[in-house]
């Protein structure tokens, strides 16, 4: 796949519902993620190899393609929804339980529980004010939803996705996350420890992925930090003095629209943005635990296996030392001057 200058990647495959002016500009090159029918044998090969692909015709969430804000407001029920509120367009995830390790950490967004109607009011109020404040609903679908949503959910193409899961010996479906965002919202680059089918329902999202072997280009926060698994690099204003390897980053990108399903492999970094001036976006994630570790390990290890090892080392050291802040100095003492230059 040829490298491109980001937005220009889409000239040939442009969907009439959006154009390049709606994409944010970044400094790194990107390649196109293949767009294929789910019946195309190449799609199966990509998923088997844990490489991303956009599937255009799975009908995975077909009954949900009618979902919009009024329909959901009428039918989603009276449960509580997790809504993140941020001062700008970037919603950097953080683990509230890990905040105890970093007393000085100040989250860039806050999470509030509210009814769906309260979220809609808050979103419309924010849109009308035109200020910097933004909201993003991120809620696991649960049994508080109304009957019509349940009927839609049961009508998803479970036959197809269950076969995908079985073929690859993945673990169970852990959750279906409903995401409703304002135009221009950004979820900065991070990776998950689960397999993900990312089903777009309303509006368009640009998804930029990076393979696990670009770990050293993306500088994740330490495992004990609240922003574990998130990149420290600000894509809009990268600090190359602090993060010099980011100059070597190469992304894989696609814009997904209603009915598209993007396979995001486990441990692949992904940066997700709702298009500028593209209206509200609705997405449902299908998250699966990965396949169990094979009894016989094959060498050389794959990049994602090395990421898992690094995570385990950080976790073990944090527990052994009794203080996560001692992990970095100990690793530096171990490596500096010993492993960081060629040994004869």
UniProtKB/Swiss-Prot annotation:
Pfam families per the UniProt record, alphabetical: Cupin_8 (PF13621)
SUPFAM superfamilies to which the protein is assigned, alphabetical: Clavaminate synthase-like
Name under which the protein is recorded: Hypoxia-inducible factor 1-alpha inhibitor
Keywords tagged on the record: Acetylation, Cytoplasm, Dioxygenase, Iron, Metal-binding, Nucleus, Oxidoreductase, Transcription, Transcription regulation
SMART domains cross-referenced by the UniProt entry: JmjC
PROSITE patterns documented for this protein: JMJC
GO biological process terms held by the UniProt record: negative regulation of Notch signaling pathway; negative regulation of vasculature development; regulation of vascular endothelial growth factor receptor signaling pathway
Single GO molecular function: peptidyl-aspartic acid 3-dioxygenase activity
Statement: the UniProt record of this protein carries the keyword Oxidoreductase: yes
Cofactor: Fe(2+)
Residues in coiled coil: none
Gene3D superfamilies per UniProt: Clavaminate synthase-like (1.10.287.1010), Jelly Rolls (2.60.120.10)
Taxonomic source organism: Danio rerio (Zebrafish)
Reaction catalysis annotation: L-asparaginyl-[hypoxia-inducible factor alpha subunit] + 2-oxoglutarate + O2 = (3S)-3-hydroxy-L-asparaginyl-[hypoxia-inducible factor alpha subunit] + succinate + CO2; L-histidyl-[ankyrin-repeat domain protein] + 2-oxoglutarate + O2 = (3S)-3-hydroxy-L-histidyl-[ankyrin-repeat domain protein] + succinate + CO2; L-asparaginyl-[ankyrin-repeat domain protein] + 2-oxoglutarate + O2 = (3S)-3-hydroxy-L-asparaginyl-[ankyrin-repeat domain protein] + succinate + CO2; L-aspartyl-[ankyrin-repeat domain protein] + 2-oxoglutarate + O2 = (3S)-3-hydroxy-L-aspartyl-[ankyrin-repeat domain protein] + succinate + CO2
Sites of N-acetylalanine modification: 2
Site note Important for dimer formation, residues: 331
Function in brief: Hydroxylates a specific Asn residue in the C-terminal transactivation domain (CAD) of HIF-1 alpha. The hydroxylation prevents interaction of HIF-1 with transcriptional coactivators. Also hydroxylates specific Asn, Asp and His residues within ankyrin repeat domain-containing proteins.
Source organism superkingdom: Eukaryota
